[in-house]
């Protein structure tokens, strides 16, 4: 007797009007995560998840497609306005913000949360010449 296949749970669509878009932009990749105000993730996207590989992941064009994909997933959950938090020095920062706006999300604020060291770790030894 064959075992019945377990039924996959249907995704419950939430209706959350406000969200936070976290853009993590490094020199190698860009990751966009849209969460509700409590921090629960509604949708996310990255260059690798879309299909970019290697050095193409670090381009502004990749960041644009990433933001559009994350915004589409957020809008499926009812998000209409987002507050943007940008972290990191990468090339996809501005392109990701513009793409969120073009996708139909209203941006209420933009905040830069890039970590800056208060004198951090000791630098490497100076080259002797």
UniProtKB/Swiss-Prot annotation:
The keyword Cell membrane does not apply. GO terms for cellular component: ribonucleoprotein complex; ribosome. Gene3D superfamilies: Ribosomal protein S11 (3.30.420.80). It holds the Pfam family Ribosomal_S11. Keywords: Ribonucleoprotein, Ribosomal protein, RNA-binding, rRNA-binding. One of its GO terms (biological process) is translation. Coiled coil: none annotated. GO terms for molecular function: rRNA binding; structural constituent of ribosome. Part of the 30S ribosomal subunit. Interacts with proteins S7 and S18. Binds to IF-3. Belongs to the universal ribosomal protein uS11 family. PANTHER family: 40S RIBOSOMAL PROTEIN S14/30S RIBOSOMAL PROTEIN S11 (PTHR11759). Located on the platform of the 30S subunit, it bridges several disparate RNA helices of the 16S rRNA. Forms part of the Shine-Dalgarno cleft in the 70S ribosome. This is Small ribosomal subunit protein uS11. It comes from Mycoplasma mycoides subsp. mycoides SC (strain CCUG 32753 / NCTC 10114 / PG1). The lineage of its organism: Bacteria, Bacillati, Mycoplasmatota, Mollicutes, Mycoplasmataceae.
